Amino acid sequence: MGLWFEEGAEERQVLGPFREFLKAEVAPGAAERDRTGAFPWDLVRKLAEFGVFGALVPEAYGGAGLSTRLFARMVEAIAYYDGALALTVASHNSLATGHILLAGSEAQKEAFLPKLASGEALGAWGLTEPGSGSDAA
């Protein structure tokens, strides 16, 4: 048994091609996107093919059903090249799909999770309302 921080066989199988994609597709324009604030919709569509937008969504709802550990490694790999894109993926999974999985009705899960998991829809989360503040706790 390996150490907790070593990549297992499944992780290497997923992360190897994923890292190659990131190096070839995400890295080249990262500095320019950061400078201009351009949102990389083309990369979002390509990342969707790797299942990152449904990484933590169960397969029953169209997701990849990956482990939290593998998902964290995927976000880490994206962040190595593009922090903003990594945050997009992380917030989509934790704040959007995560909250639907946690507190959504079955009807809401069936309506929203397949589109979110496939990358057809990009999740968002609103915190501040006029006149009420921003305390997420």
For each feature predicted by the language model, list its residue ranges:
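Intrinsic disorder at enzyme termini
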Residues: M1-Q13
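Short non-domain terminal segments
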Residues: L3, G16-R19, G37
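General helical secondary-structure elements
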Residues: G8, L15, G29-A31
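A non-catalytic, amphipathic alpha-helix used as a structural packing/dimerization or gating element
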Residues: E10-A24
